[in-house]
Each structure stands twice: as structure tokens, then as C-alpha cells.
């Protein structure tokens, strides 16, 4: 029986080009997971979009002397190009400035307000006296009070991932003027997290199979006591507050409305497909499963704050899992577009086959700890594992068949050696599938590549290029077995490398069309043409 699987993926700020850390942190893992669930027959809804209200956008707009919408339009278009080139299979990739999103944000705000989970409170907010304006949290930088990182932002420290308020920073400085920030009293709406603390704590205790760094952090955060958090700010750029109690110059704070985007994107998908109630299959159906693919800096918002909002709103599904990745490091530093650490994604896509890039990243996913990635290691994997092992295997078998047989004859009389190889593959799909379902994506790819090695070993041991000189029938059996195994390898590798896997699958005529399993190869017909799958780097 098929299941409804919601794959919710972090919303990138439309403020700058992406890098490998973003792709390996959230978007590639989500796509691997979604593609697997589709091929086994589950109903997948994969959603995200460009976050257009984050303060990094206004910071960039100020620096370039343009309007925030100009920055948004530029980078949203750029992101769409990335997803197309990398074959990221969105069901809906949208933005946080659609009418649907604003309506859903207002609905949740009003519902929580009516339930007493939102109230007005006075607080101190960073202020730049020389500019005569309040400063959004990301306009403030200083030293982290927890780890002493010198470039911590007013909302979070990139080094230790602690969420912060600007007044906690040591020597907080305005990014606009460079002057020390002052703090002035202002009034805002706050989300009363304390009201759902007990219920949230009980829910977290039910979560099994989460990555240790996610569940341990979430439990620790709640154990320390949840503090009410401001959900509005003194801003010009953002979603309007649906009530007028605070006066002008106030907007909904991005961290509150961005996570609501998963729900609004699902509703928008249903509207686009003329099935306005279809979103309920993933949000109201108690049997549905929801997975949030994010980086570790987003754990507070997805493992604590978003579940708190959902608990307060009531009746919507809570996360099944939040498989947050840690950081991809470049020469010991977190990859960062804003700080220029690591190449941009455009630079890699100009040089790499997108599937090869997906493979290199998937081989180094930072699932349990920060993961160093170097271009030399990526090139080694491409040359040794894709070109020499997988791509060469396909070419060897295809060329042997084309050079020696007009077509493969009907198969029978397979040896124990042949049947043993094919039986190994029958087990592989269950083992690797279980690993993917646990979001163990790096190890499941390693396991899949072991089967490429098995086929190469089988081919080297059986030597059909020699056997054909004395026993053409036996050589045909060997190549039939190898071709069956290659088709199975393409199925195993499809979630990771969809484009090249489809090229292989489409070139092999089959009597069955299993997308996740071993197929019966059609005999008596010619193979379709297939070119080189990957290029070697010098």
C-alpha cells in the first residue's frame, strides 16, 4: 500500500549564488529521498521555494543600491536554473511572496493570536543612531557569547549554531555604519513558546531514529526552558502584520513566516493542479509521513519552533523526521557564499557532468559530522568510481554484445555463478531501500557501488571476450547476466544519478519495467545506442 510522503526542503535566501554546501546540505539529499519513494510507488510531494524576505536580501540590496525585489528576481531565476541542471525534482518550487503564502501566514498568525499563543510585549531592539533606524538581527554582528566566534550574527552564530538575540552579542556592531549598536525599547508580537513547552517535550520523547545531533540539541533546547520569541520586527521589507495594533513600520519576522512556507507551498501545488483539497493528503492524513531536509543551522526552527507552531495551530501533521545535515567544509571552513569560501555552484556546473557532481557530493554527505570536501577527492571519485568502474562496465558489456552478437538469444542454462550474481541483486534492493528510508544516504550509495564492483568482478572472472572463441552460447549467457545486472545497477543508482541511469535503462530492452528491482531482459532484439556516460578529468 502506497504512503503519502512530504519532502519539505529548506528555503534558500534569494540573496546570492549557491555553493556545494547548500546542495549537499539539503537539496540533493531531499531529491535522492524523494526519487526513491516515487520509484517504489509512494505519493511524494516535494516542496520548497526562495525565501524573499530574509534580511540578507535587504543587506545585499543596500550594498548594491537596488531594491530588494531586484535581488529576489535575480537569484530566484538563478536558483531555478540550478534545479534544472541538477535534476532536482520539485513538485512545487515557489517563493514566500505569493498570495497563497501570505494568506496561510495570516491564517496561522490569527489562529495563534486568538488562542493566546501570540501576544504583545516590549523588548530591546538594536538601533543605529547615526542612521536613525532599528536594525534587523542580521544587520548586527559581534562576538558570540558562547564560542567567541568573532563574526556571529544577531540571530545565530555560524560557528556553534546557537540561536541569538542581538543584545547577547559582545560588542555588537551595525553592518550599515560600522558603529556600535544601541538598544532601544520597541513593541512587538511574541510567540509564547512556553505555552507549548510541555507538549513539545513529550512529542520529542516519542521521536526514534532521529540523528543524534538533531534530537539531542532539540531536547537540550527545550530542557533549558523555551523563551517567548518576537515574530515581528521594525522592517520595511516583509509580510504585513494582519492586525494594526503596533502601528506602521512593522512586519512579520522572516523566521516565523518562512517555515509556514511548507504548508503554503503544498496548498499552492494543490491549487495549481486544480485539486484544492489535495494538500490534505500530506498534512491532515495521520498515516502520512513528513521529512524536513535542512542544514544544522536550521535545526532550532524545524525541530523546535515549527513543531511548536503546529502544536499551537493544531490538527496539522508534525515532522516524522528532521534529517538535518551538518556542514560541508572547504579547507576547514564552512562553505559560504556570503564569505566567499568555496566555488559557486555555477563554476562547478560549467565543468562537471551534473550527475557526476551529484555523485561526488552524495559520497561526502555530512550526515553525522562536518565533512571536508576537496576538488581533488571529487575528481578522484569521478575518474575511479564513475569513469573507470561504472561507466567502463557499461561500455565493456555493450561493446561486447554489439561486436559479437546481432542480438542476444533466448536465455537458459545459467550457471550457479550467473544465478548467484542475480540473486545478490534481489537482496540489494531491500537492503539499500531500507537504508534510504532511514535517510542513510551516503552509506546506501556506498552499498550500491559495491554491486557495480560485483559485476566488474564477475565479468573479469568469466572473461566473455575469451570464452566466445570456444563457446559462443556460454559467452552469450555471461553477457545476458551482465546486462541484467547493469540494468539493476542503473535502478539502484537512479535516485543519485537520474539522468545517466535513465540513459542506461532506456538502452536496454526489457520484458519487465521495474524501477526498483531486477528486470527480465528482452532477448531477440538489438540494444539501443549509448554514448559515454562520464568524462575523465586530467
Task: Cite the ranges covered by each PLM segment.
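N-terminal, positively charged nucleic-acid-binding surface of large information/translation enzymes
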Residues: 1-203
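Structured secondary-structure scaffolds
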Residues: 2-48, 100-104, 170-403, 444-448
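A non-catalytic, amphipathic alpha-helix used as a structural packing/dimerization or gating element
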Residues: 32, 70, 74-81, 107, ...
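N-terminal alpha-helical segment
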Residues: 53, 341, 424-429, 485
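Active-site-proximal binding-pocket segments
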Residues: 299, 361-364, 368, 374, ...
Amino acid at each position: 500500500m502506497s504512503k503519502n510522503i512530504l519532502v519539505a526542503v529548506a528555503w534558500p535566501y534569494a540573496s546570492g549564488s549557491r555553493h556545494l554546501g547548500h546542495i549537499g546540505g539539503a537539496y540533493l539529499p531531499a531529491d535522492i529521498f524523494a526519487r526513491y519513494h516515487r520509484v517504489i510507488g509512494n505519493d511524494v510531494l516535494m516542496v520548497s521555494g526562495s525565501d524573499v524576505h530574509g534580511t540578507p536580501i535587504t543587506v545585499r540590496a543596500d550594498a548594491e543600491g537596488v531594491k530588494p525585489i531586484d535581488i529576489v528576481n535575480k537569484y530566484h531565476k538563478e536558483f531555478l536554473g540550478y534545479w534544472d541542471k541538477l535534476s532536482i525534482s520539485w513538485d512545487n518550487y515557489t517563493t514566500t511572496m505569493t498570495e497563497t503564502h501570505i494568506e496561510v501566514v495570516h491564517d496561522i498568525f490569527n489562529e495563534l493570536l486568538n488562542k493566546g499563543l501570540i501576544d504583545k510585549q516590549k523588548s530591546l531592539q538594536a538601533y543605529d543612531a547615526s542612521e536613525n533606524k532599528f536594525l534587523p538581527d542580521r544587520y548586527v554582528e559581534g562576538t558570540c557569547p558562547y564560542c567567541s566566534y568573532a563574526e556571529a550574527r544577531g540571530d545565530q552564530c555560524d560557528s556553534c549554531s546557537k540561536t541569538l538575540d542581538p543584545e547577547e552579542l559582545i560588542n555588537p556592531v551595525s553592518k550599515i555604519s560600522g558603529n556600535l549598536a544601541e538598544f532601544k525599547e520597541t513593541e512587538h508580537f511574541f510567540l509564547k513558546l512556553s505555552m507549548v513547552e510541555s507538549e513539545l517535550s513529550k512529542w520529542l520523547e516519542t521521536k526514534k531514529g532521529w540523528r543524534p545531533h538533531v534530537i539531542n540539541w532539540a531536547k537540550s533546547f527545550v530542557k533549558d526552558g523555551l523563551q517567548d520569541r518576537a515574530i515581528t520586527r521594525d522592517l520595511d521589507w516583509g509580510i504585513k502584520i494582519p492586525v494594526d495594533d503596533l502601528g506602521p513600520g512593522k512586519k512579520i519576522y522572516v523566521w516565523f513566516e518562512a517555515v509556514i512556507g511548507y504548508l503554503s507551498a503544498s496548498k499552492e501545488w494543490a491549487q495549481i493542479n486544480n485539486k484544492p483539497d489535495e494538500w490534505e493528503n500530506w498534512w491532515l492524513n495521520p498515516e502520512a509521513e513528513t521529512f524536513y531536509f535542512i542544514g544544522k543551522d536550521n535545526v532550532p526552527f524545524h525541530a523546535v519552533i515549527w513543531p511548536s507552531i503546529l502544536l499551537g495551530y493544531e490538527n496539522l501533521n508534525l515532522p516524522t523526521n528532521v534529517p538535518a545535515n551538518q556542514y560541508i567544509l572547504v579547507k576547514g571552513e564552512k562553505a559560504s557564499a556570503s564569505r566567499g569560501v568555496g566555488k559557486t555552484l555555477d563554476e562547478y556546473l560549467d565543468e562537471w557532468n551534473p550527475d557526476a557532481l551529484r555523485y561526488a557530493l552524495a559520497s561526502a554527505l555530512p550526515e553525522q559530522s562536518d565533512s571536508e570536501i576537496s576538488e581533488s577527492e571529487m575528481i578522484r571519485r569521478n575518474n575511479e568510481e564513475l569513469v573507470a568502474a561504472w561507466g567502463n562496465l557499461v561500455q565493456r558489456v555493450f561493446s561486447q554484445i554489439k561486436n559479437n552478437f546481432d542480438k542476444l538469444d533466448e536465455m537458459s542454462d545459467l550457471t550457479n555463478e550467473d544465478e548467484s550474481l542475480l540473486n545478490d541483486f534481489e537482496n540489494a534492493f531491500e537492503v539499500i531501500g531500507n537504508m534510504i528510508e532511514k535517510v542513510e544516504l551516503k552509506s546506501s550509495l556506498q552499498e550500491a557501488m559495491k554491486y557495480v564492483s560485483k559485476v566488474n568482478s564477475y565479468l573479469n572472472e568469466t572473461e566473455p571476450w575469451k570464452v566466445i572463441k570456444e563457446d559462443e552460447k556460454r559467452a552469450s549467457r555471461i553477457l545476458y547476466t551482465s546486462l541484467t545486472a547493469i540494468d539493476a545497477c542503473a535502478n539502484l543508482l537512479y535516485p543519485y544519478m537520474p539522468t545517466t541511469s535513465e540513459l542506461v535503462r532506456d538502452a536496454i530492452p526489457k520484458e519487465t519495467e521495474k524501477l526498483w528491482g531486477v528486470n527480465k531482459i528482452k532477448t531477440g532484439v538489438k540494444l539501443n545506442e549509448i554514448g559515454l556516460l562520464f568524462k575523465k578529468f586530467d
